Amino acid sequence: MRSAQVYRWQIPMDAGVVLRDRRLKTRDGLYVCLCDGEREGWGEISPLPGFSQETWEEAQTALLTWVNDWLQGNEGLPEMPSVAFGASCALAELTGVLPEAADYRAAPLCTGDPDDLVLRLADMPGEKIAKVKVGLYEAVRDGMVVNLLLEAIPDLHLRLDANRAWTPLKAQQFAKYVNPDYRARIAFLEEPCKTRDDSRAFARETGIAIAWDESLREADFTFEAEEGVKAVVIKPTLTGSLDKVREQVAAAHALGLTVVISSSIESSLGLTQLARIAAWLTPGTLPGLDTLHLMQAQQVRPWPGSALPCLKRDELERLL
């Protein structure tokens, strides 16, 4: 016998979280819990403002429609990426397709003070990998910060993310301030320029490896082996169903590319599922999931080791 619940939630964010020039004061989303007999499966639907095509309200309408169809025996999935991902995760838990094993390691995210990152990395066992957002300040400053980190920690590898913020000139200004001897320790730089051609040229001219992120969600994107392209970053909330995520991972791995499963600032429930997906589909590659510290609470499923309070399901607003 099938049954389902849908919950709506809102989590206050720490001050200072800015996405594409807009301050994110709260993280808004939905959970779906599907039940079939004794089995249960959860999924998170949380479109990311400024990145997702759909709004929270549109996702809610699509989710409620899909859940009612599922209760009637329909096995299809919705089209909206965030809804398709959350619904497919709930189904994958329900049917046992999504393994329980998880990779709770996370590449620490440096959002401000480089000294803070140095302290966090000092306690990190094994390979030291961190992520730095670039493109928010002057390109010269970004280059100096990256150079400082690579100089201060000789075994550090950095993943950088520019979110297409730079013109070719700005990108070159950044590279100018990174010692050529350190550039090989930039694991990759996600989407440095506004166009793929400019990003490719940047990789050729600087020797800094790049990764595709936003490009994966563009209609004309195809997986190809390209000079200077080392990785792809997959954000499942923005991608779609779990099957689509698996297809993209397989296509990238077939070309020898590194695949990083990355957060779209999901709640703790969604992050724990991404940790399981990373362990399943990209074993051995550190996922990019260090975003929980941007929030003021966890929900339903806590992240191991987090001191944030965790709300239980009966504390959430139930829609169905």
Curated annotation (Swiss-Prot):
It comes from the Bacteria. GO terms for biological process: menaquinone biosynthetic process. Disulfide bonds: none annotated. It catalyses: (1R,6R)-6-hydroxy-2-succinyl-cyclohexa-2,4-diene-1-carboxylate = 2-succinylbenzoate + H2O. Mg(2+) binds at D161, E190, D213. InterPro entries: Enolase-like_C_sf, Enolase-like_N, Enolase_C-like, Mandelate_racemase_C, OSB_synthase_MenC1, OSBS_N. Pfam families: MenC_N, MR_MLE_C. One of its GO terms (molecular function) is magnesium ion binding. Belongs to the mandelate racemase/muconate lactonizing enzyme family. MenC type 1 subfamily. PANTHER family: O-SUCCINYLBENZOATE SYNTHASE (PTHR48073:SF2), O-SUCCINYLBENZOATE SYNTHASE-RELATED (PTHR48073). Converts 2-succinyl-6-hydroxy-2,4-cyclohexadiene-1-carboxylate (SHCHC) to 2-succinylbenzoate (OSB). This is o-succinylbenzoate synthase. It comes from Salmonella paratyphi B (strain ATCC BAA-1250 / SPB7).
